[in-house]
From Swiss-Prot:
Physiological role: Probably plays a role in facilitating the assembly of multimeric protein complexes inside the ER.
Encoding gene (name): HSC70
Protein name: Luminal-binding protein
SUPFAM superfamilies in UniProt: Actin-like ATPase domain, Heat shock protein 70kD (HSP70), C-terminal subdomain, Heat shock protein 70kD (HSP70), peptide-binding domain
Naturally occurring in which organism (per UniProt): Spinacia oleracea (Spinach)
Compositional bias (Acidic residues): 656-668
Region span, Disordered: 643-668
Length: 668
């Protein structure tokens, strides 16, 4: 690249960085009136969770199934779109149209080795769209659509938003959304975009281990404590070392692996059973998506059971060709199959400790977060690493992240009150940020684990005589050459006055905001000309037009979902009325003995005809069901009214109305 380093001290003192963080905190307080209630969403690879700070405490909100965590799954059938449990429960029967693990695709490039590996493991189709992995799926009979990972994530975020709205009884537009601490710039920005598509203002992106640390330390007062958060979830792994001191949460170092978690442990089990089936039954099920769906679900169940049992039986009815599958699985075998992956988690722990400059005996508490930390072997390895120190069981590993996000939301909205006013977060940039200089050298402006928000400037100069344009290429990574780092984006600064090499002064400024997202500016000091980075497609960022289109499509889907629900409700109303009538005319305690024979025949005829019509019109529209209900009522209601008048009972529009009030409830 045509810029060379020019000597000028560029480091900003930690005190100023700290003031920057304090300023951001004060600013958040100043902005508070603009925000409504801010919910906290843990958008997980396998499960998501939502919380809100209310009446002086955090409420983790249960979904419509009564569960406090919701599967991060989306599915399409010919009739509707399903999200959460409903999507996961039908996966084995509808594998190609059921989407999961989308967090492993978000913000990545199609050619990333992780994406190429995942493509072989999921039953749905991942396609290349402008260098990004998109999901191609049949949304209904005869219609196939292509979705970005952001759009699928937005569907899950919408589900979490609606869960919170139902609980709070009002519309929600603001949220704090969490990401793995080791997510890079593109992955953070893509998560923010997903929030926009879901109709949310993402007030802040915060790191999952930091959120979990808040959950752990919210009520901890007293002296300074060093804690290590070990966050092993369904798809990602983070380690953060923090100091907590009377409400101030300062991250000292963070490390991790954005492609390691429970899904990988499930995959090892699946590979083991696929080989076993091939050996025992001479049947290869590795390309049979339905069989794999059943096996995936059973492997996840077995893995969970082995956290509390030493042996389980993996049983699947009619796995393939009508053959029932039944095999024992011991905890020892499970640990052997995943031994290298479990041990892999210790590498980031050591790096984070080294970066924080702490000895093992200086860690006061080890906080476990994420469902995979329930695995006994993982706990054992961690305990051995810290010379026998027991990890803390003080937080719920499934809910801690959403809990912390909800607390941060209450701080931003000003609804936290006395309990949260002392809290201050000082988080860090997880990866070194810099630009390419002559010879492909990575010149670092912001080292990893720098407290954010932060701003750093450095002066560079031209490499050639009379050079009027320089290209600024921005990278993230820890290697000394840019070819081994990740390109975030590039832009040109033009209009530099021609001069001998080494004369022009070009100031490059890196600014990382509180979300961990980077902005870069380059300015020619002589002319005052400046350029800011515009995120290009090679960074994997959605354009504004794409986001707007996706927002419109998300709204259309919401409208379609509403129509589907109205259609189901209309069908249920018709069915309820018909079966009510059928029940009443055959029950002596109700209408059977009070009807004339011709009246009974008329009602029986109307009921029979309506039931046949229902069988023949499984996918009728709402209006058709409403019309049919009116037709049946037109036959039955006058007869019911006449009967009640004859018998001196209350006349009513319908026999259904005189039933117990429970008839008005939705049917399960």
């Amino acid at each position: 690249m045509a810029v060379a380093w020019k000597s000028r001290a560029s480091s900003i003192a930690f005190g100023i960085v700290l003031l920057g963080s304090l300023f951001a905190f004060v600013s958040a307080k100043d902005e508070a009136p603009k925000l409504g209630t801010v919910i906290g969403i843990d958008l997980g690879t396998t499960y998501s969770c939502v919380g809100v700070y209310k009446d002086g405490k955090v409420e983790i909100i249960a979904n419509d199934q009564g569960n406090r965590i919701t599967p991060s799954w989306v599915a399409f059938t010919n009739d509707e779109r399903l999200i959460g449990e409903a999507a996961k429960n039908q996966a084995a029967a509808n594998p190609e149209r059921t989407i999961f693990d989308v967090k492993r695709l978000i913000g990545r490039k199609f050619e990333d080795k992780e994406v190429q590996k995942d493509m072989k493991l999921v039953p749905y189709k991942i396609v290349n769209r402008d260098g990004k992995p998109y999901i191609q799926v049949k949304v209904q009979e005869g219609e196939t659509k292509v979705f970005s990972p952001e759009e699928i994530s937005a569907m899950i975020l919408t589900k979490m938003k609606e869960t919170a709205e139902t609980f709070l009884g009002k519309k929600i537009k603001d949220a704090v959304v969490t990401v793995p601490a080791y997510f890079n710039d593109a992955q953070r920005q893509a998560t923010k975009d997903a929030g926009v598509i879901a109709g949310l203002n993402v007030a802040r992106i915060i790191n999952e281990p930091t959120a979990a640390a808040i959950a752990y330390g919210l009520d901890k007062r007293g002296g300074e404590k060093n804690i290590l958060v070990f966050d092993l979830g369904g798809g990602t792994f983070d380690v953060s070392v923090l100091t907590i001191d009377n409400g101030v949460f300062e991250v000292l170092a963070t490390n991790g692996d954005t492609h390691l978690g429970g899904e990988d442990f499930d995959q090892r089990l699946m590979e083991y059973f696929i080989k076993l089936i091939k050996k025992k039954h001479t049947k290869d099920i590795s390309k049979d998506n339905r069989a794999l769906g059943k096996l995936r679900r059973e492997c996840e169940r077995a893995k969970r059971a082995l956290s509390s049992q030493h042996q389980v039986r993996v049983e699947i009815e009619s796995l393939f060709d009508g053959v029932d599958f039944s095999e024992p699985l011991t905890r020892a075998r499970f640990e052997e199959l995943n031994n290298d992956l479990f041990r892999k988690t210790m590498g980031p722990v050591k790096k984070a400790m080294d970066d924080a400059g702490l000895e093992k005996n200086q860690i006061d508490e080890i906080v476990l977060v994420g469902g995979s930390t329930r695995i006994p072997k993982v706990q054992q390895l961690l305990k051995e690493f810290f010379n026998g120190k027991e990890p803390s069981k003080g937080v719920n590993p499934d809910e801690a992240v959403a809990f912390g996000a909800a607390v941060q939301g209450s701080i931003l909205s000003g609804e936290g009150g006395e309990e949260t006013k002392e809290i201050l977060l000082l988080d860090v940039a997880p990866l070194t940020l810099g630009i390419e200089t002559v010879g492909g050298v990575m010149t670092k402006l912001i080292p990893r684990n720098t407290v954010i928000p932060t701003k750093k400037s450095q002066v560079f100069t031209t490499y050639q005589d009379q050079q009027t344009t320089v290209t600024i290429q921005v990278f993230e990574g820890e290697r000394s050459l840019t070819k081994d780092c990740r390109l975030l984006g590039k832009f040109d600064l033009t209009g530099i006055a021609p001069a001998p090499r080494g004369t022009p002064q070009i100031e490059v400024t890196f600014e990382v905001d509180a979300n961990g997202i980077l902005n870069v500016k380059a300015e020619d000091k002589a002319s005052g000309k400046s350029e800011k980075i515009t995120i290009t497609n090679d960074k994997g960022r959605l354009s504004q037009e794409e986001i707007e289109r996706m927002v419109r499509e998300a709204e259309e889907f919401a409208e379609e979902d509403k129509k589907v629900k109205e259609k189901i409700d209309a069908r249920n109303s018709l069915e309820t009325y018909i079966y009510n009538m059928k029940n009443q005319i055959s029950d002596a305690d109700k209408l059977a003995d009070k009807l004339e024979s011709d009246e009974k025949e008329k009602i029986e005829g109307a009921v029979k005809e309506a039931l046949e019509w229902l069988d023949d019109n499984q996918s009728a529209e709402k209006e058709d069901y409403d019309e049919k209900l009116k037709e049946v009522e037109a036959v039955c209601n006058p007869i019911i009214t006449a009967v009640y008048q004859r018998s001196g009972g209350p006349s009513g529009e319908s026999g259904a109305d005189s039933e117990d009030s429970e008839e008005g409830h939705d049917e399960l």
